[in-house]
């Protein structure tokens, strides 16, 4: 499950995945649309539902940014 947000100059992605050990991870990536600079952060979540809840929290945070990010892609 990958969600992607964009502003005029920046992008942000959050991906919910299961690793080889069965752990659920939320991988966040961000960077500039016109640069090669980026960052990443991985959080381990207890289960699928906690991961989905974290995606919705991230969506709320992206909406509160000034200027706000727009959800461009939501794949399940």
Model regions: which residues?
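Short, charged/polar surface micro-motifs in flexible loops or helix N-caps
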Residues: 8-10, 20-21
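Conserved helix-adjacent loop modules within structured domains
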Residues: 48, 62-64
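Short amphipathic alpha-helices within nucleic acid-binding modules
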Residues: 47-55
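Short N-terminal leader segment in a subset of presequences, especially plant chloroplast
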Residues: 9-13, 49
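Short aromatic-glycine-(Arg/Gly/Cys) micro-motifs in beta-strand/loop hairpins
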Residues: 15-42, 56, 65-68, 72-74
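Negatively charged, low-complexity tracts enriched in Asp/Glu with abundant Ser/Thr
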Residues: 1-8, 76
């Amino acid at each position: 499950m990958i969600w992607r947000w964009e502003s005029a100059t920046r992008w942000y992605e959050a991906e919910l995945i299961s690793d080889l050990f069965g752990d659920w991870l939320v991988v966040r990536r961000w960077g500039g649309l016109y640069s090669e600079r980026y960052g990443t952060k991985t959080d381990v979540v207890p289960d699928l539902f906690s991961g989905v809840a974290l995606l919705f929290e991230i969506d709320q945070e992206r909406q509160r940014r000034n200027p706000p990010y727009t959800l461009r892609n939501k794949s399940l």
